[in-house]
Every structure is written in C-alpha cells, then in structure tokens.
Amino acid sequence: MSQVVVCALYKFVSLPHFESIQKPLLALMEESGVKGTLLLASEGINGTVAGSQAAIDSLLMWLYQQPGLDNIVHKRSFDEQMPFYRTKVKLKKEIVTMGVEGIDPLKVVGTYVKPRDWNKLISDPDVLLVDTRNEYEIQIGTFKNAVDPKTDTFREFPAYVKDNLDPAKHKKVAMFCTGGIRCEKSTAYLKEQGFDEVYHLEGGVLKYLEEVKQEESLWEGECFVFDNRVAVNHNLEKGQYDQCNACRMPITETEKASEAYVQGVSCPHCIDSTSDKQRRRFEERERQMLLAAKRGEAHIGSDVSQVILSRRTEKEDQRQAQNKKA
C-alpha cells in the first residue's frame, strides 16, 4: 500500500468562532507534516490534505475534539507521492462558493443516497441525473447518462438550473459531485427553487468508487481530483491523466504527443486561446519550476489547486467585466 494518505473532508456546521482555530490547526498540520489546504468559514470546514497514516489520524482526532466538528465527512485514498507542496488553513466567507445568498444546507438539503443504493436510483427512467461538477472534470469521467451542465465554475450552476430545469417537469432530480460538498448546496438550492424530490450521492464519487465494486459500477472513466494526481481510477489510485500547467486541463499521453503540447506552456486545449505574452510568462514559470525541482524545492507556481483557483478567479473577473460592458 502507498505511504501517503490523501484525505478529503468537509462538514457544514455553524462555526461562529472559526477564526480562533486557524492558528492551532495550522500548527498541528505543520508539526505532523500534513500538507494541503483547509478552508474555514462560519458555515463549516472543507479541504483536502495528505500525510502519513498517523498524521492524518492525529489531524482527524484533533478536529473531532473541536465543538461541532465531530463526525466530519471524509474519504481516504492513497498515493505514492505527496500530492501537495504547501500547508494552508484559509479563512473564507463560504467553504464552497455558489454565490447565492441565503442557501444553507443546515436548514434544507436534498435526500442523501448511500453509494450501494445509487445505481438503483439513477437507473430509474423518471430520474434526471445531473453532474454538478465543472466541464473539465466531466470530460474525463462521469456516471452513465448523466447530464453535463457545461459550467466552468460552480457559480454558474444556479443559472443552469434557471435556464434548463423546471420543478413541474423534472419531478425527480439526482445530483453528484467529487466528494459530496457541492451537492450539499446544489440540492439546497433546488429545494429552495421548489423542486420536490431532490437526491444526492452521499460522500460523492470518491465514496462510490470506494464502496461499489468495479464490475457493478455505473461510473465511466476516471474522477478528477484537485491535487497533483489530477485524476483517480476506480481503485482510487492515480489515473492515466496528466495536467497542462498552462490551462490546468487534464490531458492524455496522446495529447502530450501533439505538436500543440509544450510542457508548461500549451496543449491542444489552450494553444489557440493564449497570447504570446502569456506563453512567454508560462515558459519562464516552467523554467523556474524545473530549476526549483533540481534544487529539491517546491516552486510556488507548482501548486495545482492554487493555480486552478487563480484560473477560475481570472475567468470570473473577465466574465463580470464583460457583463458590465453589456
């Protein structure tokens, strides 16, 4: 078994004094060698971290002892290498951002469905199955017959619902995401919009892959994860995908053989959408990363989750600017 334990965790809970646990939590993680990022907000905790079995056990035990943080939802997988470079505990307004005020999974949420019962539910022809993840995640794997909302960020999901779903027409809606947290808010949102029967996969895709045998699985492809593994297969092991360091899209070995692929600079997904100035910047970043790797250091530009977040923020800013002009 691989030595590094990767633990995705979250819990929606009222944490009025969440700021007070930031420093002791960060200190514990640094002391035990746990890397990754945890988000704290008044609505709860969310994040993915990695470390030794003992270190992850110690972290979870510490969290369980904090008021309201017992029974945190968590999923474990394994990797041969540490998938994160840094250790962070961030204070946020939301632990998962939908951008809609007043959506509170602690007050209303969809019906949880255990992984062992999921196949039966989504095989019902009257159930509309919706993948709440982003399009680049869906491209490498999803459930059979799932609808792709074609969103770039979770903030776009409410608009998808408004334009495409109807409580009078869609009587039963089932949703899923990577670890379950996005569905906490998406199902709460649908309930607020008047949808009656709303279901979501408890523990998300990762829990489904952990508990459902591959020969019985309705999952097709691999599951995108927000760390340096890029994706995991049905055994929750690192999958076959790499990632373009320029646009962060998952890429195959075939795509890496393309003339459009230059490590850290471009790939078939982004070659036509980046400027010469951007490519020069990517080239310099790649050069610095290679130098840092030779020195045995972690370059600041190599944290996958941070770059993905930056890319999302940049796209959101551009979209808002375009809307203002319109």
From Swiss-Prot:
Residues 123-217 form the Rhodanese domain. It catalyses: uridine(34) in tRNA + AH2 + O2 = 5-hydroxyuridine(34) in tRNA + A + H2O. One of its GO terms (biological process) is tRNA modification. It is an enzyme of class 1 (oxidoreductase). Coiled coil: none annotated. Keywords: Oxidoreductase, tRNA processing. Disulfide bonds: none annotated. The active site is at 177 (cysteine persulfide intermediate). Residues 304-326 are annotated as: Disordered. It holds the Pfam family UPF0176_N. GO terms for molecular function: oxidoreductase activity, acting on paired donors, with incorporation or reduction of molecular oxygen. InterPro entries: Rhodanese-like_dom (IPR001763), Rhodanese-like_dom_sf (IPR036873), TrhO (IPR020936), TRHO_N (IPR040503). Belongs to the TrhO family. NCBIfam families: PRK00142.1-4 (NF001136). Catalyzes oxygen-dependent 5-hydroxyuridine (ho5U) modification at position 34 in tRNAs. This is tRNA uridine(34) hydroxylase. The lineage of its organism: Bacteria, Pseudomonadati, Pseudomonadota, Gammaproteobacteria, Alteromonadales.
